[in-house]
Amino acid sequence: MEVKVSGITKQFDRFPALNDVSLDIRSGELIALLGPSGSGKTTLLRLIAGLEQPTQGQIFFGDEDASHRTVQERNVGFVFQHYALFRHMTVADNIAFGLKVRPSASRPPKAEIRRRVSELLDMVHLTGLEKRYPTQLSGGQRQRVALARAVAIEPKVLLLDEPFGALDAKVRKELRRWLREFHDRTGHTTVFVTHDQEEALELADRVVVMSQGKIEQVGTADDVYDTPNSPFVFSFIGESSSLPVTIRDGHVLFQGESIGINEGGTGEGELFFRPEDVVLTDEKDALYGKVTTCRRLAGTRIAEIDIANNGHEPYHLEIEVPLNAAVAVGAELRFRPTRWKVFGKK
């Protein structure tokens, strides 16, 4: 099922939670809505679900305008962060709930419901636990029950609101891998909300990066990490450093001095680069600063560097350096970005 969000604005007491947002979600796609608190990602998910109504704009399920359809009419599956399982029901009854409460005309026969529950128990690796109650399950198992319940009704779209937020790091990582396999097996169009970058980049076919009620960028994990299209995306996704620079005659200058890299255009801008995208150098045209700390991180080292700022608070950067590099605390270190992006100042 394709989903199209067209020109959606949502206001709460005149506060614009979303401002003219448009997004095309392909059938069978796994999409992550990623952003900090207050970015509008959960509001967008709730609008797709029908739990909120747009102030302006339309939401299409396929060719049908679903903007004012109820949750039931949209036939979406929704999984919450805190499971929302019925504690007095067994695992099997929780999974079957959405099928059992359907009107009699559309309710499957009991034998078909049992078959569907058995099939889903196998898919979520909970066969043998169907008679247990939620309190007898681990957090990861409960979340899989919640997902099976959402999928049991054969939803047009599956929506997940921070599905792993209540779980510890190890369980989250295991469930991420499992959810990707589950999605590939079922093929449901799936949208999930997260503030966890690693989760979004690992799981999603495409990531929708949001900030202050707007979409900043939509792309694959490679797109948003390697070619961010705004200062916000560059600074929000992964680790990065930034410095104010001037572009003159194709050369990038920092504090009036060339740093050995070139960029088209002219004028003032902000230079962004990632810790892993630098090379140490002895040449004059480079960035340089004093090493304040140096620590081991897996197969590399992270050097923290202070760069003088004309008597003001120094610029603080982190860069990766080779394990065999002679880096001493208090020493001067010279380096250049090997990959970077300069954004013009507005």
From Swiss-Prot:
One Pfam family here: ABC_tran
GO MF annotations, alphabetized: ABC-type sulfate transporter activity; ABC-type thiosulfate transporter activity; ATP binding; ATP hydrolysis activity
Reactions this protein catalyses: sulfate(out) + ATP + H2O = sulfate(in) + ADP + phosphate + H(+); thiosulfate(out) + ATP + H2O = thiosulfate(in) + ADP + phosphate + H(+)
EC number(s) per entry: 7.3.2.3
Binding site for ATP: 35-42
ABC transporter domain sequence ranges: 3-237
Subcellular location: Cell inner membrane
Topology class, membrane: Peripheral membrane protein
A GO term from the CC aspect: ATP-binding cassette (ABC) transporter complex
Sorted UniProt keywords: ATP-binding, Cell inner membrane, Cell membrane, Membrane, Nucleotide-binding, Sulfate transport, Translocase, Transport
Subunit structure: The complex is composed of two ATP-binding proteins (CysA), two transmembrane proteins (CysT and CysW) and a solute-binding protein (CysP).
Similarity-based family: Belongs to the ABC transporter superfamily. Sulfate/tungstate importer (TC 3.A.1.6) family.
PANTHER family according to UniProt: SPERMIDINE/PUTRESCINE IMPORT ATP-BINDING PROTEIN POTA, SPERMIDINE_PUTRESCINE IMPORT ATP-BINDING PROTEIN POTA
Function: Part of the ABC transporter complex CysAWTP involved in sulfate/thiosulfate import. Responsible for energy coupling to the transport system.
Name of the protein this chain belongs to: Sulfate/thiosulfate import ATP-binding protein CysA 1
Organism whose genome encodes this protein: Agrobacterium fabrum (strain C58 / ATCC 33970) (Agrobacterium tumefaciens (strain C58))
